[in-house]
């Protein structure tokens, strides 16, 4: 929810550097890649590379050029450490030790676990909350949107390409917009359905324009950063305002307050930017791991709130 906004901010900052970082600007790195490609990525040498490349690597889209970049990255890192220098970044990222076809193993596994937690909580929600609850379909839709975002986050951390990067960004933006929509339905829509319909159309238009501009015109990291910070702030303020207004009347909304505050606090982990521990675990992966129980708590809030609304609507029906 709110934490995705912080994640997008930091992803945008990293991506803005992706066109050139200290490591990939080094002549030794560039010369190494060029020489590796000349020796291994054409003619008979390329056929030899393909014949010895594991099938899972080729299926994941790892090419000879990618392998050259990976090997030369570690050559450059070794030289830096030999000379007593700090570990450099390459294309806006720290060097990670690849495991099988996973480019960033810890972040990929953590993203998968976030998705798994969301799936488990979705199944629990559908088991314990009747479909007649006023928020049922909106909450289920939010869960599927979240699952889709975590799927693409897992794919992106498994294999960083232009496509997977864009899908990770776009799906994360969709989650934040859907969280705003979820808040609108809960705070306004149950009494004023027409307002929600108009607001839903507005959000869909915003998402369409946003994705179209970044896909068809140019991927502007600066614009993407500003847009996602703006919608993230709207999301945080709206949820917090509603929770604080209703916390005495509805004790279960305290779970939502904890979720929003925790996600904001945990996002500070991303500011602790450091080279990966054991070349696997960086601040971003730690942040992903730490959000797993937070998502469970948010779905628990949605379950409690949906059951409360169901009881309220049933009581009102009896009175009528």
Curated annotation (Swiss-Prot):
<keyword id="KW-1133">Transmembrane helix</keyword>
<feature type="topological domain" description="Cytoplasmic">
    <location>
        <begin position="191"/>
        <end position="193"/>
    </location>
</feature>
<feature type="topological domain" description="Cytoplasmic">
    <location>
        <begin position="246"/>
        <end position="257"/>
    </location>
</feature>
<feature type="transmembrane region" description="Helical">
    <location>
        <begin position="258"/>
        <end position="278"/>
    </location>
</feature>
<feature type="transmembrane region" description="Helical">
    <location>
        <begin position="194"/>
        <end position="214"/>
    </location>
</feature>
<comment type="function">
    <text>Involved in the fatty acid remodeling steps of GPI-anchor maturation where the unsaturated acyl chain at sn-2 of inositol phosphate is replaced by a saturated stearoyl chain. May catalyze the first step of the fatty acid remodeling, by removing the unsaturated acyl chain at sn-2 of inositol phosphate, generating a lyso-GPI intermediate. The fatty acid remodeling steps is critical for the integration of GPI-APs into lipid rafts.</text>
</comment>
<keyword id="KW-0812">Transmembrane</keyword>
<feature type="transmembrane region" description="Helical">
    <location>
        <begin position="170"/>
        <end position="190"/>
    </location>
</feature>
<protein>
    <recommendedName>
        <fullName>GPI-specific phospholipase A2-like PGAP3</fullName>
        <ecNumber>3.1.1.-</ecNumber>
    </recommendedName>
</protein>
<dbReference type="GO" id="GO:0005789">
    <property type="term" value="C:endoplasmic reticulum membrane"/>
</dbReference>
<feature type="glycosylation site" description="N-linked (GlcNAc...) asparagine">
    <location>
        <position position="40"/>
    </location>
</feature>
<dbReference type="Pfam" id="PF04080">
    <property type="entry name" value="Per1"/>
</dbReference>
<dbReference type="InterPro" id="IPR007217">
    <property type="entry name" value="Per1-like"/>
</dbReference>
<dbReference type="GO" id="GO:0006505">
    <property type="term" value="P:GPI anchor metabolic process"/>
</dbReference>
<feature type="transmembrane region" description="Helical">
    <location>
        <begin position="99"/>
        <end position="119"/>
    </location>
</feature>
<feature type="topological domain" description="Cytoplasmic">
    <location>
        <begin position="120"/>
        <end position="135"/>
    </location>
</feature>
<feature type="transmembrane region" description="Helical">
    <location>
        <begin position="225"/>
        <end position="245"/>
    </location>
</feature>
<feature type="topological domain" description="Lumenal">
    <location>
        <begin position="157"/>
        <end position="169"/>
    </location>
</feature>
<feature type="signal peptide">
    <location>
        <begin position="1"/>
        <end position="20"/>
    </location>
</feature>
<comment type="similarity">
    <text>Belongs to the PGAP3 family.</text>
</comment>
<keyword id="KW-0337">GPI-anchor biosynthesis</keyword>
<feature type="topological domain" description="Cytoplasmic">
    <location>
        <begin position="300"/>
        <end position="320"/>
    </location>
</feature>
<keyword id="KW-0325">Glycoprotein</keyword>
<feature type="topological domain" description="Lumenal">
    <location>
        <position position="279"/>
    </location>
</feature>
<feature type="transmembrane region" description="Helical">
    <location>
        <begin position="280"/>
        <end position="299"/>
    </location>
</feature>
<keyword id="KW-0225">Disease variant</keyword>
<dbReference type="GO" id="GO:0016788">
    <property type="term" value="F:hydrolase activity, acting on ester bonds"/>
</dbReference>
<keyword id="KW-0732">Signal</keyword>
<keyword id="KW-0333">Golgi apparatus</keyword>
<keyword id="KW-0472">Membrane</keyword>
<feature type="topological domain" description="Lumenal">
    <location>
        <begin position="21"/>
        <end position="98"/>
    </location>
</feature>
<feature type="transmembrane region" description="Helical">
    <location>
        <begin position="136"/>
        <end position="156"/>
    </location>
</feature>
<keyword id="KW-0378">Hydrolase</keyword>
<keyword id="KW-0991">Intellectual disability</keyword>
<dbReference type="GO" id="GO:0006506">
    <property type="term" value="P:GPI anchor biosynthetic process"/>
</dbReference>
<dbReference type="GO" id="GO:0000139">
    <property type="term" value="C:Golgi membrane"/>
</dbReference>
<feature type="topological domain" description="Lumenal">
    <location>
        <begin position="215"/>
        <end position="224"/>
    </location>
</feature>
